[in-house]
C-alpha cells in the first residue's frame, strides 16, 4: 500500500508484511545457496514444531527454540532467527 507524503512528492510505503526479519540477504550469507537455506530452515522449523507438539503430549524429546519466541511466532520464523543469530551450524550433505 502506498501513500503520498503531504509535504513532499515522495511516496511513502507501509512497512512490509511477511518474512522480512531477518532479511533474506543476511541469511544467504550463512549458507551456500537459497535452496540450502530453504531446506535448512524447513528442517529446523519441523524440529521446533515437533517440540511444541511434544510439550502438549508431555514428552520432551526434541530441542526447543534457541531464541525466545514472540507471541504467535511461526516455527519457520523462529528457525530463520536462529540461523541469523549463528545458533545453528549448517553442514552440506
UniProtKB/Swiss-Prot annotation:
SMART domains: RNA_pol_Rpb6. It catalyses: RNA(n) + a ribonucleoside 5'-triphosphate = RNA(n+1) + diphosphate. One of its GO terms (molecular function) is DNA-directed RNA polymerase activity. Pfam families: RNA_pol_Rpb6. The keyword Transferase applies. Its EC number is 2.7.7.6. SUPFAM superfamilies: RPB6/omega subunit-like. Keywords: DNA-directed RNA polymerase, Nucleotidyltransferase, Transcription, Transferase. One of its GO terms (biological process) is DNA-templated transcription. Disulfide bonds: none annotated. One of its GO terms (cellular component) is DNA-directed RNA polymerase complex. PANTHER family: DNA-DIRECTED RNA POLYMERASE SUBUNIT OMEGA (PTHR34476:SF1). Belongs to the RNA polymerase subunit omega family. Promotes RNA polymerase assembly. Latches the N- and C-terminal regions of the beta' subunit thereby facilitating its interaction with the beta and alpha subunits. The RNAP catalytic core consists of 2 alpha, 1 beta, 1 beta' and 1 omega subunit. When a sigma factor is associated with the core the holoenzyme is formed, which can initiate transcription. This is DNA-directed RNA polymerase subunit omega. It comes from Corynebacterium urealyticum (strain ATCC 43042 / DSM 7109). The gene is rpoZ.
